[in-house]
Amino acid sequence: IGRHSGGVLGEPDALDVVSRYARNALVLVVVMPFYAKPGLYAVPDTSDVGRIFLEARRRLADRQVLLGCARPPGLHKRVTDTYAVMAGLDGIAFPADGAVAVASTIGRPFHQEHACCSIKLGAAPRPAQSRTCAA
């Protein structure tokens, strides 16, 4: 998310493409311009990221949608992770402080798995009605 200089441009089209194929999960990441020359990339606005989370959840309601570890740190990460919980994403790699509290506050069950978000060995896709937030 945010690959076009921090802007959201092709993400809705990418979700269209992904939604046409039978896949168990989608792992979303947010551009992190740490190693780019200053000014080359901008960090995407958290509200844009949140809108993509909602759209991904809506379009892929029968599949797992996960937030990978690649995302900007600090306040951006805390806000992004809050949006991920509230949008109904199924997992967050290395959740920010407060993400579990948000899940608990809004009544989303959660559990912790010690695995990479892109490797779900032995895990069957969860039905839409029993979504949990893996922290």
Which sequence ranges carry the predicted segments?
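Canonical radical SAM enzyme core domain
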Residues: 2-13
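Auxiliary Fe-S-binding modules of radical SAM enzymes
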Residues: 13-135
